[in-house]
C-alpha cells in the first residue's frame, strides 16, 4: 500500500492577488527552464553508456555488507539506497547508520550516489539531518517523498504552495550539493498526470530539484499519450526509474500487474529512442516490483532462495542494457 505524507499547511496566507502573481510567474518560466541550465539532465559520457543503480528496497533481507557485495557482483553501477521509514537506513539513525552503509558500498567499489527518502520539508529537522549527512558522504541525487492534493484546497492553489515548498527545498539542496527528484506515481498523487508538475517545478531554478521520471507509472496514467507527458517534463528530468507492467484482472478487478522488463506494456525501444533524442542520460534506478518472494515489497525475510532474486535482477539488468544499446 502506498503511503502518502500529509503536508504541513503554509503558515503564510495567500491573497487571491498574490496567488495569481505566483501562478503566472511559475507558468511564465516554463519555456526557459532546463535548456540553458549547465546542470540540465546530461551526464558527460557516451550516449551508449548508462549508470544503473539497484533499488535497495529489494535487498532489505541483507546486511549492508552483503547488499553491497551482491550488487557489485551483479554488475550494477551502485545502489539507490532506501533512507526512509522501513528502509535500509532509518531517518532517526541516519548519522550512525548511513556512514556504515556507505563504507560497505565503497568496500565493493560502489559510489554513494542515489538514495530514496521521505524528504519534503526543508524546515523539518530530521529531514535536514538526512540531507546534511548524505551530502557529507558524497551522495548527489535523492528521491523526495510524495505529495497529495487536499480536498479543501483547489489544485492550482496547491500547485502554487508546492512550488514555493520545492523552491525552499532547492535552496537547501544547493548548499549541500544535492539534487532532489520527485517521482511521478500513478493514482491520486501530485505528479501522476505529469502535466501538473510543470507549474510546481517551474517555480524552481531547475538546478537542485527536478523530476524522477517513472515510465511505468507514466504509461499506467497516460496510456498511449505518455510521449506527450515525457516531452513536457523532459527539461526537469534529473533521474529515472525503470520497471514494467501489464493490465490484468486481480480478484475480478482490472489492475496494473508488475512484470519483469520486456514482458509488459512499456515500449522500451521507443522510450529509449526518445531519451537519446532528447539527450537525457541521467542515473537510472532499477525497480523489481513483481513477485520475488517478498523482496519486491522490501521484506526483511523472503520466501525464496536469494539466488533466485539475484538471477532475476541480473536478467532485468541485462535486458535494460541491451535495450538501451539497440535503441536508435
Where are these regions (language model features)?
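Histidine-acidic metal/acid-base catalytic patches
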Residues: 2-51, 62-72, 135, 194-209, ...
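Active-site acidic/histidine proton-transfer and metal-coordination neighborhood
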Residues: 23-32, 66-68, 104, 120-211, ...
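Hydrophobic faces of well-ordered beta-strands that scaffold small-molecule active sites
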Residues: 50-56, 79-81, 112-117, 142-144, ...
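Active-site beta-loop-alpha junctions enriched in small/polar residues
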Residues: 55-59, 82-86, 117-120, 147-149, ...
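Catalytic domains of carbohydrate-active enzymes, especially glycoside hydrolases
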Residues: 67-84, 137-138
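Glycine-rich, proline-tolerant flexible connector loops at the mouths of alpha/beta enzymes
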Residues: 82-100
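A short acidic, helix-capping loop that chelates divalent metal ions and anchors anionic groups
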Residues: 86-90, 150-154, 221, 294-295
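Charged helix-capping and loop-helix junction motifs
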Residues: 94-99, 128-129, 158-166, 194-196, ...
